[in-house]
């Protein structure tokens, strides 16, 4: 069984949908696993010949090739929105997507979304740049003990679900709204007290949960597939624990953390991690963007058809890559995060096996800067390091150049720098 994680290297919008779809179309008997975030993803897939274009939110990018999607327990599906996406997909491709879900996947509710949007409005000029899809509020509600799972939606009656939602509203939502500064003047305040909103939500999600097949995802079930593709939302620089860009982050793990845990629970390991980036950097929403420029300052870069201006995300912003060191650093940091998993497991099991430490340092071929790879600790037989790839999309826009602060770098030069770090850089032209 081949296990692959597709991950955004920067702030998202790098081309993860394209990467997942290409893998799904070329690998036999594959399964796409959604493992972080929820309905806020927007992964665009275009036919290689330009005949069609579809934006995936919760349906895996690659489902158009009859590849099934699994919602892992770390994914937070928005079943209110899922019905619309499945309808659009079915009308577009002529068949329904195959959707599986782990039973304990946490469900995003309508009040999570309303609290999220209300909070962003209340923040005014200090918005976090949220997509307004309720992910942070889903996390907070579950942490407070008011969770609703996919299995709950299946087993409860409509009245059971409505009663549960009313309980959450009374015991949690009203208090949470005050904490977030959502008052009567807020346009979302009234809906947080409107019972019809809950009733409509119940009707919709009870119908849409029928689109999912609940499964016990053990190793035997996974072995029915030859290839596992972990489709990751957002990007490494938005990871919930990457404090350099706080509070403008997402409420999920955006790297190899979730796939590694998912696989190790079942006695498997992650074999490949593919980090996706454009030749330049993009970001939507509020928050820092180093080396930011206007799109017109990036030769050849055209308008992005997916990330159109909207109330929550604003306009898509552009930047040059800061330096080669900064280009590779997020990938190396994500790889080294496996050390934290090892240490936590070591504490959990009260074991103290031998630690093997290695330090790597290389000097780049294109600049005088020195890239120092952080110290790595690996234990034999645990958290095997995956092969690392950086997949560069949109190179046709930039004539095979990557845009950096101190000048453009040819793709071939980037490949050489990556090889010295144990990272293989590949271009989208190789996959078309």
Residue ranges and their predicted role:
Residues 354-369:
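Acidic, glycine-centered low-complexity repeats within long intrinsically disordered regions
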């Amino acid at each position: 069984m081949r296990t692959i994680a597709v991950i955004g290297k920067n702030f998202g919008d790098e081309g993860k949908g394209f990467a997942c779809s290409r893998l799904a179309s070329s690998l036999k008997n594959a399964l796409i696993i959604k493992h972080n975030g929820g309905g806020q993803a927007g992964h665009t897939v275009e036919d290689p010949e330009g005949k069609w274009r579809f934006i995936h939110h919760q349906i895996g990018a690659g489902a158009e090739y009859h590849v099934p999607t699994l919602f892992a327990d770390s994914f937070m599906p928005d079943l209110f929105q899922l019905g619309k996406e499945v309808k659009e997909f079915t009308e577009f491709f002529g068949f329904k997507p195959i959707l599986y879900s782990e039973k304990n996947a946490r469900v995003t509710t309508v009040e999570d979304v309303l609290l999220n949007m209300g909070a962003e409005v209340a923040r005014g000029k200090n918005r976090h740049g949220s997509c307004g899809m309720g992910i942070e509020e889903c996390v907070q509600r579950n942490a407070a003990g008011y969770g609703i799972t996919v299995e709950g939606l299946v087993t409860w009656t409509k009245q059971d679900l409505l009663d549960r939602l009313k309980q959450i509203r009374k015991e949690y939502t009203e208090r949470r709204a005050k904490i977030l500064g959502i008052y009567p003047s807020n346009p979302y305040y009234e809906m947080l007290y409107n019972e019809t909103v809950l009733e409509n939500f119940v009707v919709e999600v009870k119908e849409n949960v029928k689109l999912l097949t609940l499964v016990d995802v053990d190793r035997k079930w996974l072995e029915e597939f030859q290839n596992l593709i972990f489709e990751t939302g957002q990007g490494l620089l938005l990871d919930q624990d990457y404090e350099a860009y706080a509070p403008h982050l997402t409420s999920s793990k955006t790297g190899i953390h979730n796939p590694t845990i998912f696989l190790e629970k079942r006695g498997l390991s992650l074999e490949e991690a593919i980090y996706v980036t454009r030749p330049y950097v993009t970001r939507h929403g509020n928050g820092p963007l180093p080396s930011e420029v206007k799109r017109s300052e990036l030769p050849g870069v055209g308008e992005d058809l997916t990330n159109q201006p909207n109330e929550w995300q604003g306009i898509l912003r552009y930047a040059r890559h800061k330096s080669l060191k900064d280009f590779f650093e997020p990938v190396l940091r994500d790889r080294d995060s496996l050390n934290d998993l090892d240490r936590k497991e070591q504490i959990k099991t009260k074991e103290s096996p031998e630690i093997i430490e290695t330090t790597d340092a290389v000097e780049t071929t294109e600049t005088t800067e020195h890239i120092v790879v952080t110290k790595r600790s690996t234990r034999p037989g645990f958290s095997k390091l995956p092969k690392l790839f950086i997949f560069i999309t949109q190179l046709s826009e930039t004539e095979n150049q990557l845009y950096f602060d101190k000048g453009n770098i040819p793709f071939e030069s980037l490949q050489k720098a990556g090889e010295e770090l144990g990272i293989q850089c590949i271009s989208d032209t190789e996959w078309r």
